[in-house]
């Protein structure tokens, strides 16, 4: 098995373990980020496991993971908490770009089977909005979100994503790129 495949297997194992812990603790969550996209057909991710939790549940979620022996951190950014299953990073995101995780985040999610585990998976529009609004002068890299757009284009409500990201010049530039490459049409 290739190193990349082993890394992905470790990521999935950490996701499955954390899912079980959070479900057992009764903490509502939604799988987000690259794994939410992979669950719908995007390429494998190698970065981390992203769980979206309501702000009022974030510390309880982190404590539940800590109680199983996972190392935890409270980064200074103030919009997420972290846990580590070995060296696999698990982000507990409660206030991403675009606004805090709320009831609407959960309402838009779908229950899917991911790696033999049933869980709520974030809507693609939510993942793309968060990724586009995170782009900045310090981090202007369109490559990962462009890859997602190519692989998931037929599944995304692009009008919704455009509307929710309209205030971002980076999102505007991204949509110009998508239009010029004929990945999506206005």
Language-model segment annotations:
Residues 1-186:
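Compositionally biased terminal segments of proteins
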């Amino acid at each position: 098995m290739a190193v990349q495949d082993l890394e992905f297997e470790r990521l999935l194992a950490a996701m499955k373990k954390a899912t079980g812990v959070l479900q057992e603790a009764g903490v509502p969550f939604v799988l987000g980020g690259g794994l939410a996209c992979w669950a719908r057909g995007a390429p494998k991710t190698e970065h981390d496991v992203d769980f979206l939790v309501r702000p009022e549940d974030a510390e309880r979620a982190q404590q539940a993971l800590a109680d199983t022996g996972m190392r935890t951190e409270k980064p200074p950014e103030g919009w997420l908490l972290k846990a580590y299953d070995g060296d696999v990073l698990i982000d507990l995101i409660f206030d991403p770009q675009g606004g805090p995780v709320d009831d609407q985040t959960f309402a838009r999610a779908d229950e899917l089977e991911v790696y033999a585990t049933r869980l709520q998976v974030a809507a693609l529009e939510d993942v793309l909005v968060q990724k586009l609004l995170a782009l900045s002068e310090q981090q202007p890299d369109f490559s990962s979100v462009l890859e997602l757009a190519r692989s998931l284009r037929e599944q995304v409500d692009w009008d919704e994503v455009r509307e929710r990201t309209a205030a971002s010049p980076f999102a505007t530039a991204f949509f110009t790129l998508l239009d010029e490459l004929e990945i999506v049409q206005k």
